[in-house]
Amino acid sequence: MAKISCSSFFVLMLVFSVFSLVEKAKGDERCTIIIHPGSPCDPSDCVQYCYAEYNGVGKCIASKPGRSANCMCTYNC
């Protein structure tokens, strides 16, 4: 009887661990927002504003070659 209880315990722990990992993965979603879309991007301002407002990472990225860069902020949703 002890062998059945021990193996059942380990199976339940394995199932519980898998569900815990799945829930954690769902919570790690990342969002992206364009900050001040019409304004030219200053890299230092972009980084500081994104971190202060969203606790994220800001980068100046041009949507197409030849266009001015926009401040793209990536943060946890």
From Swiss-Prot:
Segment forming the signal sequence: 1-27
GO biological process: defense response to fungus; killing of cells of another organism
A single cellular component GO annotation: extracellular region
Keyword entries, A-Z: Antimicrobial, Disulfide bond, Fungicide, Plant defense, Secreted, Signal
InterPro entries: DEFL
Compartments in which it is found: Secreted
Cysteine disulfide partners in this protein: 31-77, 41-60, 46-71, 50-73
Pfam families found in the cross-reference section: SLR1-BP
Family the UniProt entry places it in: Belongs to the DEFL family.
Protein's name according to its UniProt entry: Putative defensin-like protein 157
Gene source species: Arabidopsis thaliana
